[in-house]
A protein has these predicted regions:
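Basic, amphipathic N-terminal segments that precede the first structured/catalytic domain
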Residues: 1-60, 193-200
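Catalytic micro-motifs at enzyme active sites that drive phosphoryl/nucleotidyl and oxygen chemistry
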Residues: 53-55, 63-64, 118-122
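Conserved catalytic cores of phosphodiester-cleaving nucleases, focusing on short active-site segments
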Residues: 65-67, 72-80, 110
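Short, flexible loop/turn elements at secondary-structure junctions
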Residues: 29, 41-43, 50, 69, ...
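Short, low-complexity, polybasic intrinsically disordered segments
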Residues: 125, 129-196
Length: 200
């Protein structure tokens, strides 16, 4: 079994679960598109897979989406910051709290579900995995080393807060996902990243 076989098996096991663009799986974007970028790739809504898999049991946090890319099986988690920054008065503490995602737990639950669906306990010894954390803000902003200086100089600019959001979330990614390759990208960069991964 390869990554595409696993992807297709998930779809055939749960025919009520559909594929969609990454924008459709991000709740703020699914209701009102914030950008004009048209992304063509389709992803399995893995939250819907978890709901079906755990029906009648306590629901567990899982990744938002999965996708095959060449030999790799990609677990994808979406974390939007734009609406949070628009609707709230940003603070260091607030951003730290928002960034405290159980990424490791989401990955482990999702792996367990894939193992059960495949019927192969060692499926991820056969299929290499990748974890991709996707956000809706620019990930090229400067890190926390410039945060305090920027706060004094540019206290009202959103890019300063985006920098803090990126630093906190990337820190969570680095600390929690330690056994497989991981990437932190914007939604606009996702398809290009998948193309790169598929050529490895």
């Amino acid at each position: 079994m390869d990554a595409k076989d696993l992807y297709d098996l998930i779809l055939s096991t749960y025919p009520s679960v559909t594929e969609g663009a990454i924008c459709d799986l991000h709740k703020p974007c699914s209701k009102h598109r914030e950008c004009s970028i048209k992304l063509s790739n389709k992803y399995i809504d893995f939250d819907a897979v978890e709901t079906e898999f755990d029906r009648g049991r306590v629901s567990r946090p899982s990744v938002d989406a999965v996708k095959n890319a060449g030999q790799y099986f990609c677990f994808i988690e979406i974390k939007g910051w734009k609406k949070y920054l628009e609707w709230n008065t940003p603070s260091e503490k607030g951003i730290q709290e928002q960034a405290e995602y159980d990424l490791k737990g989401k990955l482990e639950t999702s792996e367990e579900i894939c193992v059960a669906i495949s019927g192969q306990h060692n499926i991820f010894r056969q299929i290499p995995e990748v974890f991709i954390l996707v956000t809706d803000i620019d990930v090229s902003e400067q890190g926390v080393e410039n945060f305090h200086f920027n706060m004094m100089a540019l206290a009202t600019t959103s890019s300063v807060w985006e920098s803090k959001c990126n630093t906190e979330l990337n820190s969570q990614l680095e600390q929690q996902i330690t056994t497989i390759p991981k990437y932190y990208v914007t939604c606009k960069q996702l398809e290009n990243k998948l193309n790169v991964i598929s050529r490895v």
